[in-house]
UniProtKB/Swiss-Prot annotation:
Gene expressing this chain: Antp
GO cellular component term of the entry, any: cytoplasm
GO molecular function per UniProt: DNA binding; DNA-binding transcription factor activity, RNA polymerase II-specific; RNA polymerase II cis-regulatory region sequence-specific DNA binding; sequence-specific DNA binding
Name the record gives this protein: Homeotic protein antennapedia
Biased segments, Low complexity type: 101-132, 243-281
Localization annotation: Nucleus
Keyword DNA-binding: yes
Major location category of this protein: nucleus
Coiled-coil stretches noted in the UniProt entry, renumbered to this chain: none
Species this chain originates from: Drosophila melanogaster
One annotated GO biological process: specification of segmental identity, thorax
General remark: Loss of Antp results in altered development of the embryonic thoracic segments. Overexpression can cause antennae to be transformed into legs.
Similarity comment: Belongs to the Antp homeobox family.
Amino acid sequence: MTMSTNNCESMTSYFTNSYMGADMHHGHYPGNGVTDLDAQQMHHYSQNANHQGNMPYPRFPPYDRMPYYNGQGMDQQQQHQVYSRPDSPSSQVGGVMPQAQTNGQLGVPQQQQQQQQQPSQNQQQQQAQQAPQQLQQQLPQVTQQVTHPQQQQQQPVVYASCKLQAAVGGLGMVPEGGSPPLVDQMSGHHMNAQMTLPHHMGHPQAQLGYTDVGVPDVTEVHQNHHNMGMYQQQSGVPPVGAPPQGMMHQGQGPPQMHQGHPGQHTPPSQNPNSQSSGMPSPLYPWMRSQFGKCQERKRGRQTYTRYQTLELEKEFHFNRYLTRRRRIEIAHALCLTERQIKIWFQNRRMKWKKENKTKGEPGSGGEGDEITPPNSPQ
């Protein structure tokens, strides 16, 4: 499947100065009998070092880029095309530079290619020595390459060092057209990341700044909640798909988010000391007792022991009313308070009156006088 000479020439004109390798023009194997190609039409890295006026295809410029960067024989639009070519075939193939065709043979050895690259390197060094002032102005700009990626078009020193390193190494694996845009993109990316990082770090703080109105520590309770939902909960409007506010923190740790909300279900008679004392959870209605404030101090019924009841009955049999001194003595003897002794005697007198009233109705009133203690003040 060999192609004719006309077809080959049309293909080379179609691909614009034959950016494909020399071994890819006439099939998979070189040396297939077609040797009538013009080597001057092929612009490779190792040929035409002094063709400033006859510029090759901008997608594949030669090694001597110094005159083009300084503005000699190349306008700004073409220079922009040199920089912005992300899909170069040299980077797609793997960065291997095509071999030049010399003396009617295909596949020049790599050592001869290095020898052909040396004149272009000497020319670059001469141009660098002729413009020492430009180099001194551009050397400080190398340190500012990360912060100012737009100034890379004015820094030929960086590209000159890369070309010299690629020529001395003789490997040619560094794609000339792919590395500078990659550095440009990476430096711009890191610069944008550094510029946007403090913005995003300070953004939640700015959005959570309104939580200082009534909520002490919202970030500890709900870091994963959306700020919009938090704002709606503060304004009294629950977010879409959110559970009720009364059930939001039931069973969780510190539900501090609902202490200052207008839509809280806690009744207005909540103890104000619960918030100021630093309690971990507010006092919900089911935690409160069913009695009012005045009834909360009511004590339960005192259960007297059999010994206490026996001693009190003995004292009541002799005296219905007790003096202050006797009340204190009985309180110390029975380990009770004076109030308990006084209440017990009051209840016991009411019981005694009921008993006397029922007993005095069927008979005479003399029976009631017999039950009355003799020393009781009536």
